[in-house]
Amino acid sequence: MRRPAILAAAVLLAPLAACSTVKEAVKGPDLAPVGYPAPLAPMQQQYVSAREPAPQAASANSLWRVGARAFFNDQRASRVGDIVTVMIDIDDSASTKNATNSSRTANMKAGVPHLLGMESSLGKFLPGGFDPASALETNSTTTNAGSGGVSRSEKISLTIAAVVSQVLPNGNMVIQGTQEVRTNAELRQLTVAGIVRPEDISSANTIRHTQIAEARISYGGRGDISRVQKTPAGQSLVEKFSPF
């Protein structure tokens, strides 16, 4: 009874998987949502529970507030709704080159001096005769050569303002920001999201993209130019599902 149920479930779930594949082929892959913690691998992540920040005790007869980083006021983002400037300066490059060469030659020769006394009689039935000293002989030669290379370079230099959307129990903050610029019929979109530490925010209320955990950075656009540069949906589907 269980086998038909499993087959029925597979049949019902197959269209859902196909729909997801079709959507990705047409619209492109989506960024993973930002959460805390975000699953970095297909397994259950175990994290130490974040501790609550220690309460700030008031200092009697003092103008200095415990935990403050400035004498008058800390102007850096620290609460939900505060704005922090994200400095994005990506200049990455990678180059890989591999080459493989292999060859192998094998020879084998075997004789049968005695074959139940029939070694002399076999020559009468075989067209070329029978030589017991070279009854079996094989030769094989294998040669394999392969090479591959990957070269990639990315450079992005942008500045975007993000909003604190959540303050975690340990004091870290979840930020997310979106910037859109429209030029004629082309819309450029820049999004950034991730988790930052208050200590990493500079006195100018800025933070570098390398200091953002679970960073999700997207730079793209949509419009007439992007539509022309994009592969048609029909062609994408054919290339996605074609076995050749």
Curated annotation (Swiss-Prot):
InterPro entries cross-referenced by the UniProt entry: Flag_Lring
Topology term for the membrane: Lipid-anchor
Molecular function in Gene Ontology: cytoskeletal motor activity
Protein keywords: Bacterial flagellum, Cell outer membrane, Lipoprotein, Membrane, Palmitate, Signal
A Gene Ontology term for the protein's cellular component: bacterial-type flagellum basal body, distal rod, L ring
Keyword Cell wall biogenesis/degradation carried by entry: no
Annotated signal sequence range: 1-18
GO process terms (BP): bacterial-type flagellum-dependent cell motility
The organism's place on the tree of life at top rank: Bacteria
Lipid group attachment sites (S-diacylglycerol cysteine): 19
Subunit relationships: The basal body constitutes a major portion of the flagellar organelle and consists of five rings (E,L,P,S, and M) mounted on a central rod.
Function: Assembles around the rod to form the L-ring and probably protects the motor/basal body from shearing forces during rotation.
Protein family per UniProt: Belongs to the FlgH family.
Name under which the protein is recorded: Flagellar L-ring protein
